[in-house]
């Protein structure tokens, strides 16, 4: 029996920010438990490096969960216990890119993933 995870990646702009955001799906839409995926979000229309950025997700039950945050500038990172040690948020200010590396994926990680400012 295949216990693959169905992961869908979306990008959400919060606070009425006027910018274009591209989303990139990486690694396909289905991953086996224990697998890895990297999400990427490219932003424009604001000074990316000045803002903290986050990843959030919406579960199949429609719950919103915070996944990770990274500060602007020095880039401090923050995670809930549910993903700490498995997920890594990072940013490339020169390219206006936000990333989420997800390792050791489980069925609990099945969700819609959103990039947010």
Curated annotation (Swiss-Prot):
The keyword Mitochondrion does not apply. Residues 86-117 are annotated as: Framework-3. One of its GO terms (cellular component) is extracellular region. Residues 1-19 form the signal peptide. InterPro entries: Ig-like_dom (IPR007110), Ig-like_dom_sf (IPR036179), Ig-like_fold (IPR013783), Ig_V-set (IPR013106), IgHV (IPR050199). GO terms for biological process: immunoglobulin mediated immune response. Residues 20-49 are annotated as: Framework-1. Residues 50-54 are annotated as: Complementarity-determining-1. Keywords: Adaptive immunity, Disulfide bond, Immunity, Immunoglobulin, Signal. Disulfide bonds join 41-115. GO terms for molecular function: antigen binding. It holds the Pfam family V-set. Residues 55-68 are annotated as: Framework-2. Residues 69-85 are annotated as: Complementarity-determining-2. It comes from the Eukaryota. The keyword Membrane does not apply. SUPFAM superfamilies: Immunoglobulin. This sequence belongs to the VH7183 subfamily. This is Ig heavy chain V region 7-39. It comes from Mus musculus (Mouse).
